[in-house]
Amino acid sequence: MVLIGGRTHLLPHEPAALGVALGECLQQDGIELVLDVRAIAARRENSEYVLRLEDGREFRGDRILVATGRRPRTADIGLETVGIEATQGGIPVDTRMRAGERLWAIGDVTGLWQLTHVGKYQGRVAAANILGEPREAHYEAVPRVVYTDPQAAAVGAKSGPFRATAKLSQVAKMATYTRVAAESNGFLTLFSDGQRLTGAVALGPEAGEWIQQATLAIAARIPLPVLGDTIQPFPTFSEVYLEALKSLHQAIQA
């Protein structure tokens, strides 16, 4: 398998360390990475597909999977009849998901976050407002998960005044996972303003599950001392928070 991308590392919208580490994992699994170059043409030759890159290289294979993202479909659905003017990014909405008088929009069509769980969240916000229960949508703690093996996950800010990283191998050797996972390059990085968590990125088995501790901490603005005093179950990957928070405390006190 060959993975071709136009950026210098995978997951270009996340901190570089996450994309680089994921790339190393994929390469260990035998996937060839061809980065910082774009595909410009494709053709069929007999039973093979041929993909040509802008630097002249060609790759042959049985299948080509093109991942180009998606765009909100707002044309020809009658928006003009209800006084709504969509932009290239989608249908503009306010914090209560209102697109206009007695009109609401949720999900990908808003162009805000093209994630299923965000669409569900927006649906709950819209439903509450429709029922006369004022509620606003907030996006400071949106979890983002890439379901590779291992999983890559992130939430909140992508940088901050203070940061600390803990390797998953510090705790995985005691967890109920295989030794292969324990020896992986998985990690947890926390970002902070000095008082609370503002962001986190993680790589490792089921990272989309244990990133949720950071999601809740950011959403609820939980003070760092409270997080540091939280008991983590043994043996689990969640113990990596203890190491990361200890390092974060040292960075803040330095």
Protein language model annotation of sequence segments:
Residues 1-48, 115-120, 128-160:
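Rossmann-like dinucleotide-binding cores of NAD(P)H-dependent redox enzymes
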Residues 44-49, 100, 182-185:
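A short, glycine/Asx- and small/polar-enriched loop/turn
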Residues 26, 79, 123, 195, ...:
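Residue-level signature of catalytic and energy-coupling elements of molecular machines
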